[in-house]
């Protein structure tokens, strides 16, 4: 009787080796099948590589003061927008405000920022690459790159348009050399 129970146990309860091998054998067909990723669908995922970004001179400033690249939407069209702004050393915006919040991420370099209607480049605060700045709607501020800097700053700016830029003092230029 002992022999018979032993043989039934073997049939009902497989050895430990079989328990360990079962999941591996079940997964084997998955590992052997070779699948290639589908080609990217530009209607679903749009990619712009760095060498494809179209930079244009900032119309409100002198040549080589700042450049802008629109990646999505537009500053004067209703809806979301994403732009890149590049400030060169020595140039800053005059105090101004926007009708909507702006969310800004420093991508490279150091951005110098401050709030208020007075323009004092020495009172600006440095925001290095990786830093985040939220510009609250209808609040005056100014920013750019101090002339002592050795490289430009590139900022990714996200928000809702139209931005409706308003200078604190429209009788003065929209930029300053600082």
State the predicted function of each range.
Residues 93-95, 113-114, 135, 140-147:
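Short beta-strand His + acidic residue motifs that chelate non-heme Fe in jelly-roll/DSBH
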Residues 1-15, 22-30:
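N-terminal secretory signal peptides
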Residues 81-97:
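Conserved short histidine dyad/triad with adjacent acidic residue
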Residues 88-89, 98-118:
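Glycine- and acidic-residue-biased ligand/ion/polar-headgroup-sensing regions
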Residues 119-137:
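Short acidic-glycine-tyrosine-enriched beta hairpin
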Residues 36-79, 169-178:
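A short, N-terminal "cap"/entry segment at the start of jelly-roll beta-barrel domains
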Residues 128, 138-163:
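Ligand-binding loop in jelly-roll beta-barrel domains
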């Amino acid at each position: 009787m002992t022999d018979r129970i032993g043989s039934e146990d073997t049939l009902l309860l497989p050895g430990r080796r079989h328990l360990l091998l079962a999941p591996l054998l079940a997964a084997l067909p998955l590992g052997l099948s070779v699948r290639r990723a589908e080609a990217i669908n530009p209607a679903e995922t749009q990619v712009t590589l760095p060498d494809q970004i179209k930079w244009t001179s900032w119309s409100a400033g002198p040549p080589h003061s700042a450049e802008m690249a629109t990646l999505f939407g537009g500053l004067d069209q209703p809806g979301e927008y994403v732009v890149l702004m590049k400030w060169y050393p020595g140039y800053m915006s005059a105090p101004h405000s926007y009708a909507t919040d702006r969310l800004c991420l420093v991508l490279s370099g150091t951005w110098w920022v401050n709030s208020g209607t007075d323009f004092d480049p020495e009172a600006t605060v440095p925001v290095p690459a990786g830093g985040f700045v939220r510009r609250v709607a209808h609040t005056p501020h100014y920013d750019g790159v101090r002339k002592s800097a050795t490289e430009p700053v590139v900022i990714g700016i996200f928000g809702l348009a139209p931005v409706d830029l308003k200078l604190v003092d429209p009788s003065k230029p929209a930029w300053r050399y600082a």
